[in-house]
Amino acid sequence: MFAVVRVRGSAGVRRDIADTMEMLRLNRINHAVLVEDTPSYLGMLQKAKDYITWGEVDQETLTAMIRKRGRLIGGDRITDEYINEKTAYGSVDEFAAAVFSGEVKLEEAGIKPVFRLHPPRKGYEGIKKAFNEGGSLGYRGEKINDLLKRMI
């Protein structure tokens, strides 16, 4: 499972790339979504690589994102009581483990699919270069977890 974060804004974006970002639900800077590792999603990520960054999220970071930044439809925070009542899981930690393994999706539990994050502490490395060139854009593998922890 990939975590995808929008790094750059919408000014001057080609129409087809803007449509791809809309399909990924990345409408604003510092918004993050979770996507499966499928060929169709990988193609979308490659198309928008000059405006986003992505990598494999780990379970600890995913749990922290759901607990601190996840919101219910209507804007309320996610609580253990809500998860216990609306799903078959007893706590947010168990639910996050199920999301990580692919057993359940966020939308099935009434949770918004987009995480609105803070800008990263200490800033981005640079929003015009690829990650492997010392910037912030494109694929970054496991290092996405470091970025997400700075943004939660």
From Swiss-Prot:
Q: Does the keyword Ribosomal protein apply?
A: yes
Q: Record's superkingdom?
A: Archaea
Ranges that cross the membrane: none
Question: By its UniProt entry, which InterPro entries does this protein fall under?
Answer: Ribo_uL30_ferredoxin-like_sf, Ribosomal_uL30, Ribosomal_uL30_arc, Ribosomal_uL30_CS, Ribosomal_uL30_euk_arc, Ribosomal_uL30_ferredoxin-like
Q: Name one GO molecular function term.
A: RNA binding
Return any one Pfam family short name.
Answer: Ribosomal_L30
Which GO biological process entries does UniProt record here? maturation of LSU-rRNA from tricistronic rRNA transcript (SSU-rRNA, 5.8S rRNA, LSU-rRNA); translation
Keywords from the UniProt entry = Ribonucleoprotein, Ribosomal protein
PROSITE patterns per the UniProt record, alphabetical: RIBOSOMAL_L30 (PS00634)
Which Gene Ontology cellular component terms are annotated? cytosolic large ribosomal subunit
* Subunit description: Part of the 50S ribosomal subunit.
Q: Which NCBIfam families match?
A: PRK06049.1, uL30_arch
- What protein family does this chain belong to? Belongs to the universal ribosomal protein uL30 family.
What is the protein named? Answer: Large ribosomal subunit protein uL30
Upper lineage ranks? Archaea, Methanobacteriati, Methanobacteriota, Methanomada group, Methanobacteria
